[in-house]
Amino acid sequence: MDNQKALEDIRDVFSIFHDGTIETWNGNQELLKLKIDCEYLAERIDKSYASFYVKFEKIESLEFNPWMNPINQPQILFTSIVDIFQATLEILSAEIENEFVKITCNQHNLYFNYCGGTLLVNCKNVKVFDEKNNELTIDELDKICNEYWNEVNDQIEKSIIEKERK
C-alpha cells in the first residue's frame, strides 16, 4: 500500500470512529492492535458487539502531544506506546497533516495532567476487525456509519414533523 493511501485509510477509519474511545492496546511498532469502543456502530454488525479492533502495521511514527491541564504545566510529548495509551482517548476527528494523520482526542480521567491532545500516526497499513476478528474494509465500515447517521437524521426529521403537526 502506498503511503498516501495508508494515510487516507487511517484518516477515514478514525473519522468514522468519531466519539469512539481507544480503550486498550497490545503490540509494538511492527504490529499494534487497538481496541476501539464504538458501540453505536459495532451493534449494527451484531447487537452484542461494542467494539472494533484496529491494527497498524509497520508504524513509522507514533506520538501524542497532550493538552496540559492546567495549561501552565510544562509541555510534554509521548513517544512510547505505553505512555501514549495510558489513558482512554476519545476520538474527535482525524485529518491528514504533512506525512501524518492527526487524530484529535479528548481525555477525561482527572488522574492525568492532560485533558486530551493530538495523536500523530504514520504506518504502512491499517486494518479494521469486528469483535469476532472478521476484517472489515473501509467501504464496509463507511456504509455501516452512513446507514447509522441516515437513520438518526430520519428520526430527527420525523420528530420535527410530528412536533410541527401538534
List each language-model region with its residue ranges:
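Surface-exposed, interaction-prone regions used to assemble/regulate multi-protein complexes
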Residues: 1-166
